């Protein structure tokens, strides 16, 4: 057997190492060029890839790896290694990017995209348009080498912060406050709400507001919409939630025939965006053109969402097409990098409060970050909208819609309306099953919550890579602490009791589903099924 020695560089999420490995070269001796796929077969057979990943130090880090090696690269002398494919990432993708120099063709991105998210392989190739992608970012959580990441907007945000003419306002999503600490060595799920606000103020943001506020606003609009459909438009039942942009795009691709079931409500991020440049700008006497709106999200798809053409309600309202509702999105991971760039030790910061006008949030809004949380929050307020009474205790701790099960079902009796049947779904493979039941007229529900990522936003594609691949222990710790925030003593637990949201209606929107609310807080969708047409 012919043997040779190769000097090989192996990349991980943060480091690069080099080493000299003995490999069997017989199959390659007669070739002038070796394909990337064949090269990784060669390296895998010698144990180079697996050994190299471990040698980078991931196994000794609290975050960012734990030394995870895809099965086919474990050990050595396992020729021939089965080198797998990978998902395509277009250069125009607004959410995701790949560093080819780090890709080891392990196939984990393809695995999660196909088997968990049910996107890859659900269309015939070749297609005529860009590669279908719902931008969920789950591939970035499964990639063992850090080759797949979010497309960073840190530089744009830093530039805005350095511009004295700009007023930079930032909103933070509920799920980020139970994950950010993991990037600083804290236990998974640690609540760092006040520290996160303090860090953002230290960095130099002019105002820090809470996406929980607009989650409460979303509940006011969406629960009102459900009541309207139950009473007047039953042909649009069941109503689908629409706050997850990955799910929405999935529905546009693969469910265009049932898209009328989607709620017209924007996500909390996209509701808060136009309000910062209209309502907030007027209250603070700031020119809307000078406001830069940034959001901190657990989700890579939010980068795509803020760039959707229709997300310019503030620009339409103000007659200036250059004004976008949300200018930049940073993931939880990007925020951690920004904090470290500014040499801030998150663990030592004193808690700071959110700023007023758009800063109040209820416990109902906070549980948006967990699968089932949107449904629980919505039904609490739906009950109040119909009865004008607060919901019973059981709806404040609605166990039937909690937990990590991919599909959950529940029902609630609402006086004058009767039994309302609901379902909660996370993971797009599960969504595909639910969609088939809608088509087959076998779905008994009036209201369905959909989240693209298994477990909901707590396990979004922009969250810390605390374990590779993601595991339910970490999802559970993050989820439990969101529910702790909801049940904390003194916390309002009903979205309709958010005083700042009520002030918004009194001063600006009038009431849920009003003409002004429809302009700023509601949207429309695009049939993307034709984008899956086979290229001819």
Across the structure, where does each feature detected by a protein language model lie?
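Iron-sulfur cluster-binding cysteine motifs and their immediate structural context
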Residues: 59-64, 71, 75, 80-89, ...
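Iron-sulfur-associated redox domains of electron-transfer enzymes in respiratory
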Residues: 36, 40-46, 59-64, 140, ...
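N-terminal secretory signal peptides
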Residues: 1-35
């Amino acid at each position: 057997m012919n043997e040779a020695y190769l000097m090989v560089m192996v990349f991980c999420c943060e480091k690069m190492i080099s080493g000299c490995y003995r490999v069997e070269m017989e199959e390659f001796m007669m070739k002038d060029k070796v394909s990337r796929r064949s090269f990784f077969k060669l390296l895998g057979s010698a144990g180079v890839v697996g050994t190299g990943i471990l040698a980078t130090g991931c196994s000794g880090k609290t975050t960012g790896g734990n030394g995870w090696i895809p099965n086919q690269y474990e050990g050595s002398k396992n020729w021939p290694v089965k080198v797998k494919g990978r998902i395509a990432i277009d250069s125009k993708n607004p959410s995701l990017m790949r560093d080819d120099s780090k890709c080891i063709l392990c196939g984990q991105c393809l695995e999660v995209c196909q088997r968990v998210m049910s996107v890859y392989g659900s269309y015939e190739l070749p297609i005529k348009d860009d590669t279908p992608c719902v931008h969920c970012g789950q591939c970035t959580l499964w990639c063992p080498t850090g080759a797949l990441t979010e497309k960073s907007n840190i530089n744009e945000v830093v530039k805005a912060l350095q511009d004295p003419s700009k007023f930079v306002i930032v909103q933070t999503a509920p799920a980020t406050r139970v994950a950010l600490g993991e990037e600083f060595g804290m236990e998974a799920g640690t609540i760092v709400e006040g520290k996160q606000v303090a860090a953002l103020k230290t960095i130099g943001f002019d105002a820090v507001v809470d996406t929980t506020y607009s989650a409460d606003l979303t509940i006011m609009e969406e629960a009102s919409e459900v009541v309207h459909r139950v009473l007047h438009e039953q042909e649009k039942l069941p109503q689908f939630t629409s706050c997850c942009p990955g799910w929405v795009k999935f529905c546009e691709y693969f469910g265009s025939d049932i898209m009328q079931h989607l709620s017209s409500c924007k996500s909390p991020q996209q509701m808060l965006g136009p309000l910062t440049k209209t309502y907030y700008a007027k209250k603070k006497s700031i020119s809307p053109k000078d406001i830069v709106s940034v959001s901190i999200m657990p989700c890579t798809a939010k980068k795509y969402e803020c760039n959707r053409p229709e997300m310019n309600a503030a620009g339409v309202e103000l007659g200036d097409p250059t004004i976008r509702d949300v200018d930049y999105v940073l993931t939880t991971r990007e925020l951690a990098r920004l904090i470290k760039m500014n040499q801030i030790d998150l663990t030592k910061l004193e808690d700071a409060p959110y700023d007023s006008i758009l800063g109040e949030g209820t416990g109902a809004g906070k549980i948006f970050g967990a699968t089932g949380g949107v449904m629980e929050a919505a039904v609490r307020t739906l009950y109040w909208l119909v009865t004008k009474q607060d919901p019973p205790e059981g709806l404040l701790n609605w166990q039937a819609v909690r937990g990590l099960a991919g599909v959950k079902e529940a029902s609630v009796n609402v006086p004058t309306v009767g039994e309302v049947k609901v379902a909660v779904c996370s993971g797009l493979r599960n969504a595909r099953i639910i969609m088939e039941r809608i088509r087959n007229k076998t779905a008994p529900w009036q209201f369905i919550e959909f989240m693209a990522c298994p477990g909901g936003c707590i396990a979004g594609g922009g969250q810390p890579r605390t374990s590779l691949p993601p595991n339910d222990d970490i999802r559970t710790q993050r989820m439990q602490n969101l529910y702790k925030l909801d049940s904390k003593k003194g916390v309002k637990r009903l979205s309709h009791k958010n005083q700042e949201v009520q002030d918004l209606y009194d001063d600006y929107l009038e009431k849920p589903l009003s003409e002004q609310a429809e302009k700023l807080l509601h949207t429309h969708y695009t049939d993307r099924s034709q984008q899956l047409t086979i290229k001819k």
